[in-house]
Amino acid sequence: MQTHEIRQRFIEHFTKAGHTEVPSASLILDDPNLLFVNAGMVPFKPYFLGQQNPPFENGTATSIQKCVRTLDIDEVGITTRHNTFFQMAGNFSFGAYFKEGAITHAWTLLTNPVEEGGLGLDPERLWVTVFTDDDEAAEIWNKKIGVPEHKIQRLGMEDNYWSMGIPGPCGPCSEIYYDRGPEHGQEGGPIVDDTRYIEIWNLVFMENERGEGLGKGNFEIVGKLPKKNIDTGLGIERVACILQDVDNVYETDLLRPVIDVAQEVTGAKYGADQANDVRFRVIADHSRTGLMLMLDGVTPGNEGRGYILRRLLRRIIRSARLLGATGETLEKFMDTVRETMTPSYPEIAENYERIRAVALAEEKSFLKTLESGSQMFDNWAHEAKERGEDTVPGDVAFSLHDTHGFPIDLTQEMAAEADLKVDIDGFHELMAEQKARAKADNNAKKLGHVDQTIYRPFVDNHPTVFTGYENLADEASVLGIIRDGALVETAPEGAAAQVILDRTPFYAEAGGQMADRGEMTSTSGAARVEDVQKVGKKVWVHHVTVSGGELAVGQKVQATVDKAWRHQARQAHSGTHLIHAALREVLGPTAVQAGSMNKPGYLRFDFNYGEQLTEHQLNQIEEIANGAVDSDYQVNTIETSLEEAKAMGAMALFGENYGSEVRVVEIGGPFSMELCGGIHVEHSSQVGPISVLGESSVGSGVRRIEAYTGMDSFRFLSTEKSLVSGLATSLKTPSEELPDRIDALTAKLKAAEKQIQQLRAQQLQGQVGQLVEKAETIGEVKVLAEQLPEGVAAGDLRTLAMDAKNRLGSEPAVVVFASVDGEKVPFVAAANDAAVDKGIKAGELVKTFGEKVAGRGGGKPAMAQGSGSDAAGISAGIEAVKSALRG
């Protein structure tokens, strides 16, 4: 039975029984503490925790959830039991049925004949386990289902009591095992041999509430849940192994085809060598996981989810190389995964070009450094063994990471293969130093390269009170003044200084929002506030220029934020939230923020996405964001605990460190809800019009949208309107017909340019006969090396060179032509068969020529071409070619 049919039978069984089918959630959820969805019940957590009411008819649901677990990446391939991606089929009840219902459903589906919609497993080969004290479940299995008592084994809390690992719902569970037969191990049930008896289905009877505690079974039961719930999980891949009668998941219809393709690509044979078998299995497992992660929008990166994907893809590439592959291989593996997984996940087909592009870009990037990095490691390992060393130093691992792009896990893997260890602490120290240097340099730039220890007394003893959420002005005391890197008592007129106040209404740069501008005044002077930065997240440092009189430590000042600046900054920041929400509505939940910057009237928003956005998508995003503006949503800020914020559905950034108390900015209820400490408008209508300028790439898998808000958006639209009006007047065409008019003019221009090129080529071709007469003999070779008139494109040069070569006859002959085409210097070399037989290579000649014109080129012995940028070197290039032919 094919895996896709197993999935269908599972869903059909439960939907016929009144369960609501729930599509698989994305592998990526809005949970900063969860790398990937790793269990079938994860999307249902809000219902089990009582945070939301289950919306399912009859109070029951069924799903087949995509899952990824990455703790065992290093074990993948070494054993046949570990996979990074798997499919968890489950049925869920929220007070509708309990133990007897769950047990009956599972047994019926597993043992009913295939012709009746079941999976047709032999009941005699099924064993079950129950929690030690769960007499009720044991009795149901024995009395209701008919499982013999000796096949019902009891286990303790460590094995048969489920919880989420934190205080909350929990309960005993019952697991169903399949006996693979005596050839797989000793008799006696799962408590004796879990290799022979494999777990296929876990039934969790969620009825209690657990308290604090560590470990699987080290906690107390503190109460009963108001409803008794059911959460089950069946491993699709494990059932496929049984029904396809194969030893492990790598032999199933999902992964074996990838191994077969890997054999073709590499020339190695699966099953012939243990080390190579591990590599084959790594390729199969990681190719599937990689594709499914990219399907859900993950792109390779250096942190978090992106790092996991990068690690998986680079393990595939290296494994293929070690098996004997040359060149690029990922596309073939991904193509095979597409074929095996699309029947279950048809969305792969419409997203495949994006997935393929992301994978190939990562492969090209890694192949550039794989060989040099591997050579560096091999050389070091050889020398280290000769010295009797057994540990790769942290600096070597750091160099492989920093220079060659080797994830530390890959270096550890290579070290293990060479019977070496890695100084992982030393590596992390160097990584931390690098990050600290970058952070210190960034902070130093922001703080005017002042030694930050000067701020320590203020950070420790006088944290700034921020009043800017409520006020645009406040009275404050001057606690400190810094000039030229030193604490001073006063700052005179014209001086640039950093001023520290006990309280301030000025927003300091944070969260992508530019700092407020404004002024501070006292009885003795005034200063312009030109920037505000935080030190130690506690002290606001105001960068000022004293505009009159002087400021002094200890005096009172009136700190006033520029009202217009703040208003436009608030528009941009709230506009950023609207753009983010619109992006996710158009592109899906994987379009997660990667960075942002907003200043008065302007915003830019970076997000994880693997391909260029279409004009239609940009228009959709702009329309949705402006629709939110038009809806005049209320903007609310809520200060609450991190857990409560997540329960509310507030979006948090993965990998970001949040405190126990957070601030939630909510725009229009569910439309946008994010953790944010920034300044925002009171109503979405105050953002004003949002004009999306466009989008661009800012790195591998990261795109950027830029937009204007408020009056800047209006001015942009006004300028665009004037531009369109001017074009319409110049072209004597109504504005709505401009696109067609411009297309027609462009087509005419291209046709005219093509005609000019053809006429020029004909003219030059007519002159080829005259050029051939200029050929000279060098040794035994006829050589025609000339600079042609300006404006001859590379393609025409090639045609002319071929014509000239043919006219020079059958004796050894070489042609080298060059021209100046705009800012480029195209050049070409052609050699006839007789010249090639004498060892002359056109590719070598263009390399010689290219050195003189700041260019490069290459090709085959008979024809090669290149391009340079220094037209002044053409004559020298011609002479260099002639010298090379003279020998």
Swiss-Prot record:
Keywords in alphabetical order: Aminoacyl-tRNA synthetase, ATP-binding, Cytoplasm, Ligase, Metal-binding, Nucleotide-binding, Protein biosynthesis, RNA-binding, tRNA-binding, Zinc
Pfam families linked: DHHA1, tRNA-synt_2c, tRNA_SAD
Superkingdom of the source species: Bacteria
Catalysed reactions, as listed in the record: tRNA(Ala) + L-alanine + ATP = L-alanyl-tRNA(Ala) + AMP + diphosphate
EC number(s) on file: 6.1.1.7
Gene3D superfamilies per record: 2.40.30.130, 3.10.310.40, 3.30.54.20, 6.10.250.550, Bira Bifunctional Protein, Domain 2, Threonyl-trna Synthetase, Chain A, domain 2
InterPro entries (alphabetical): aa-tRNA-synth_II/BPL/LPL (IPR045864), Ala-tRNA-lgiase_IIc (IPR002318), Ala-tRNA-ligase_IIc_anticod-bd (IPR018162), Ala-tRNA-synth_IIc_core (IPR018165), Ala-tRNA-synth_IIc_N (IPR018164), Ala-tRNA_ligase (IPR050058), Ala_tRNA_ligase_euk/bac (IPR023033), DHHA1_dom (IPR003156)
Entry binding sites for Zn(2+): H573, H577, C676, H680
GO CC annotations on file: cytosol
NCBIfam families (UniProt xref): alaS
Domain notes: Consists of three domains; the N-terminal catalytic domain, the editing domain and the C-terminal C-Ala domain. The editing domain removes incorrectly charged amino acids, while the C-Ala domain, along with tRNA(Ala), serves as a bridge to cooperatively bring together the editing and aminoacylation centers thus stimulating deacylation of misacylated tRNAs.
Role summary: Catalyzes the attachment of alanine to tRNA(Ala) in a two-step reaction: alanine is first activated by ATP to form Ala-AMP and then transferred to the acceptor end of tRNA(Ala). Also edits incorrectly charged Ser-tRNA(Ala) and Gly-tRNA(Ala) via its editing domain.
Protein name: Alanine--tRNA ligase
Source species: Corynebacterium jeikeium (strain K411)
